[in-house]
């Protein structure tokens, strides 16, 4: 089997530069950080509950969707790709209504 290691450098998003309107790629991590900064700035100092779960679901649900498409619904293959148990994958799919 071919060992395919995904590095964080491969997880990039494309955004449009505000001044030049040219597409710019940046790591997914930067996009998540910026989204969190924007979200917290809109709170104007108010407390928020369950932020961790909210952020996790915003990332996890689309990831599951794309991986299940990529594996053509093969849960065993998807679980291996994600490095999780197939039972855990099934629970996550059910949680997001993807079963």
From Swiss-Prot:
Key words, A-Z: Activator, DNA-binding, Transcription, Transcription regulation
A Pfam family hit: HTH_8
Keyword Protein biosynthesis in record: no
Cited Gene3D superfamilies: Homeodomain-like
HAMAP family associated with the record: DNA_binding_Fis
Job of this protein: Activates ribosomal RNA transcription. Plays a direct role in upstream activation of rRNA promoters.
Entry protein name: DNA-binding protein Fis
